[in-house]
Swiss-Prot record:
Compartment list: Cell membrane
Molecular function per GO: ADP binding; ATP binding; proton-transporting ATP synthase activity, rotational mechanism
Keyword field: ATP synthesis, ATP-binding, Cell membrane, CF(1), Hydrogen ion transport, Ion transport, Membrane, Nucleotide-binding, Translocase, Transport
Disulfide linkage: none
The organism of origin for this protein: Bacillus cereus (strain ATCC 14579 / DSM 31 / CCUG 7414 / JCM 2152 / NBRC 15305 / NCIMB 9373 / NCTC 2599 / NRRL B-3711)
EC number from the UniProt entry: 7.1.2.2
Stated name of the protein: ATP synthase subunit alpha
Amino acid sequence: MKHMSIRAEEISALIKQQIENYQSEIEVSDVGTVIQVGDGIARAHGLDNVMAGELVEFSNGVMGLAQNLEENNVGIIILGPYTEIREGDEVRRTGRIMQVPVGKELIGRVVNPLGQPVDGLGPINTTNTRPIESPAPGVMDRKSVHEPLQTGIKAIDALVPIGRGQRELIIGDRQTGKTAVALDTIINQKDEDMICIYVAIGQKESTVRNVVETLRKHGALEYTIVVTASASQPAPLLYLAPYAGVTMGEEFMYNGKHVLVVYDDLSKQAAAYRELSLLLRRPPGREAYPGDVFYLHSRLLERAAKLSDAKGGGSLTALPFIETQAGDVSAYIPTNVISITDGQIFLQSDLFFSGVRPAIDAGTSVSRVGGSAQIKAMSKVSGTLRLDLASYRELEAFAQFGSDLDKATQAKLNRGARTVEVLKQGLHKPLRVEKQVIILYALTRGFLDDIPVVDITRFEEEFHAWLDSNATDLLEEIRTTKKLADDDKFAAAINGFKKVFVASE
């Protein structure tokens, strides 16, 4: 075996080469220390360069959102269980602001405000995300509301019409049918090429389950996303839920689609935000809400819009809910949201308990922009409806005191009683707009004046079934032209049914 000589110069050259090629990868991350934790809030020291609204990560993997940037510490709201976080734990910056997954993969699913599925149907396969806080469309990016959003509820489509891109507040006490109005509207969007997002804020888990089952039963879950932050969730998730919902909707809006977002309800979001603000030691204002509670709702609802054609012509319609206490609409949060929205639908508990359902108060409900979105046929037949109802309510009060009424007053009372009956509607029975037009035409033109009040509901149900088999051409004409057909056609259809209708004894 030959003896191999090792030269010192070769070894030193190799070592020098290795040293020259050596690259040390140093990872620099901003790390802080938790100095206080409790009630879903943590304070951390050392995160000097953190951004407002930046996501931070605790050592146990729970995420947080930097909110209060103070001189010597940062107030963080914790987006998950905070009981595992201890004083002295490490917290590090992520360099990202909060984002949620978006896209058509979410349709038909139930998710939490972080976009994580909670329906047990496996993971959601989408890589697209959008920041949860984004600016609302600018003035030049918008277009005035001109397309109708048919709710399928006669009292709304006739008296307080809603257009695509509008913000219409639904306000009333608890147990007055607010959620039912929203669900009927979602169910009525079938075949309308509309994507619906139902955001449940602070609801009971059982209530959310019922909502999901109702949507599934009526085939509405195929075009609906449910975002839920139930009453058992920490306050930060209740605060973030509406923003998560609108962010998911914006993805479709900016792609030229039409979206309906229901926030059920914003009173609970405001209460959650008040809780967070007080725990972060922000100064309280009226009713202990922080000074920026108006901005909390305005920046959310301003993201609803009808986009200009240059931006794709998509729309996002918002139906925020506010729960009042004993009908007090002059409280802080109700007045704030009334001033932000383009109209409101008042639901009165007195009407609800007297059997008028949906319990819409026609006198105080308004739609500030929806009138221009109403189809011509509907605006023609519903023109006198509000006045008829208002004069009926007024005369009804006087009629209780006197029995001797002249014929004109008696006629108004009779027409008013029939109007109230026609505007009643069963739960989850939305009505197509062409059928609404025909029954309202019959009402306002006096065709129902000789039908007993007790028979009005039955007359309407049987009339709709009769139309489906005997007057499909008339329904199709209203659906396609969106205008009133010839008066003779209407009269022939209505009188044709009246001949076969049998009034009760």
